[in-house]
Amino acid sequence: MLHPVVAFGKMISFSEHLLNKGQNRKLKGALAAIVLVLAIYFVASYLFRWVASSSPGGFLTLQILAIFFCLAGTTLVREVRMVFEAVDRSLEEGRKQVARIVGRDTSELSAQEVRTAALETLAENLSDGVIAPLFWYILLGVPGMLAYKMVNTLDSMIGYRNERYRDFGCFAARLDDVANYIPARLTAFLMILAFPRGGFWNLLKFVGMYGNQHASPNSGYPEAALAGILNCRFGGPHNYFGEEVWKPYIGSNGRLLTTEDMKIAVSVNRRAEGIMIIILIITITLVSFFI
């Protein structure tokens, strides 16, 4: 069975190959993104209505499969664990392992930078890989969740500021920012609620202070929540394949990160996911009761 995200990737690649040329690339990119997202939403809506009317059991099975395919939490947790295990063995192994989950040059990273990159990615993934899909499922059902995954896949494939995608992927990147605006902040809140080490209100203030320091309008919030919980510092200079990019620091304690920090970060993720699932179950129960 073809994974939906793989299918989305093929659709995006086809659209990009067809349209990312000549004049009006911004307009073409915007139209491609809008058509793809709306197509996924309406096709999924029609399909699920048809299945629900003909086979309630099949409808439930299809919903479960869609949710399973749209969530991306377990795989990254495993990868982050492997990064910490690898860097404990050797710096070179750690660099190679973290390269699997980050989009930057890892060949010159220090051990601290390897661990930092892994934890930053873990925090970001909790938002766009777990909390955001469930958020859109609560709002718009499986079609909304699938449409969100298309938005997220568009951003990951063409939402770059390089020469090839600067114009064509501009709208996709902004659309992803909008789709993740509430989920990113909700993720930070759930992380603090799940693991209020250092004090719930202190952590909220910390996120309020550092959450908007990131270049992304959204990624800084879950990163700030994790940095506050761990009492550490994220951000700083990064090498993106020959180009040095400075990311503002999130937090002020530049202490060395350890395997224990990774274990706490994983626990934070799992607890936040659990709270979101409880919210989902309560919402479904209330909707079923009143409809």
Please place each PLM-identified region on the residue numbering:
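Hydrophobic alpha-helical transmembrane segments
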Residues: 1-146, 159-291
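Active-site His/Glu-centered metal-binding helix of metallohydrolases
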Residues: 150, 154, 158
